[in-house]
């Protein structure tokens, strides 16, 4: 029962916060590299995923040592502070990375299961509190002190681990299905491209389609409404 769960602030259960949001290679006397250590920024984090891999930059060994006085470790939680705001990622790798723009790294105390904390942080309850603590109008962002005030509710450690294991297995299945779908989409695209290149007849798009315009029944005519046939508007598509 969740009524038995204890409530803490994120700061209560956090061992370390890594925050290098103001750093850049130029400020450290260097520049980006063509290869080396990946530098992840907020735009590369979407809850549960690394995205836009083509935008990821790199630094060499010397720059990495200057930049990352505290290193990201397996089990850490990455949180975007703005643009986009409130995206969460569980770092489940031994790869060494650089924390770049608009990104916090939170390390949870050993008495708590970090994967469970990650799953709690992506719940509507926690995300709603993040929204409430954010500031800004044009660009919405979150300051570290406000992040640490956010509330976390936890069961006993054995239950944390059990819940995290179940949710992790579901995530793994989703990821596997996504990879299958990506592969099928690539195959379909390649097959279509092959057919397209062999086409010998070219026609205009409007020659093979029929365009139908919609309308709205009179709202004052009750016989037009509350029937069994669905009525779609643009917002339903």
Label each region the model flagged:
Residues 1-23, 149, 153-215:
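Non-catalytic DNA-recognition/assembly elements of restriction-modification systems
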Residues 3, 81, 97-104, 115, ...:
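A short glycine-rich beta-alpha junction/loop motif
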Residues 7-30, 43-74, 206-222, 230, ...:
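Sequence-specific dsDNA recognition surfaces
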Residues 41-42, 58-126, 143, 233-234:
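A short beta-sheet element
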Residues 45-46, 83-85, 135-136, 214:
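Short glycine-enriched loops at secondary-structure junctions
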Residues 52, 99, 146, 187-188:
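N-terminal alpha-helical segment
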């Amino acid at each position: 029962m969740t009524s038995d769960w204890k409530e803490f602030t994120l700061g209560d259960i956090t061992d370390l916060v890594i925050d290098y949001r103001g750093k850049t290679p130029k400020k450290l006397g260097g520049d980006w590299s063509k290869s080396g250590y990946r530098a992840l920024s907020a735009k590369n984090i979407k809850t549960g995923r690394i995205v836009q891999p083509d935008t990821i930059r790199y630094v060499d060994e010397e720059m990495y040592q200057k930049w990352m006085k505290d290193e990201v470790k397996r089990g850490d939680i990455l949180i975007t502070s703005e643009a986009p705001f409130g995206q969460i990622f569980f770092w489940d790798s031994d790869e060494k990375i650089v924390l770049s723009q608009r990104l916090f790294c939170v390390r949870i105390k050993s008495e708590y299961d970090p994967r469970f904390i990650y799953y709690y942080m992506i719940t509507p309850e926690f995300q709603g509190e993040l929204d409430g603590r954010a500031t800004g109008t044009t660009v919405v962002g979150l300051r570290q002190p406000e992040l640490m005030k956010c509330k976390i509710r936890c069961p006993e450690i054995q239950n944390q681990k059990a819940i995290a294991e179940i949710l992790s297995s579901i995530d793994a299945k989703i990821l596997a299905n996504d990879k299958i779908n990506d592969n099928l989409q690539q195959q379909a695209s390649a097959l279509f491209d092959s057919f397209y290149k062999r086409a010998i007849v070219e026609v205009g798009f409007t020659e093979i389609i029929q365009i139908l315009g919609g309308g709205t029944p009179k709202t004052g005519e009750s016989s037009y409404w509350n029937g069994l046939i669905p009525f779609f508007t643009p917002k339903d598509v």
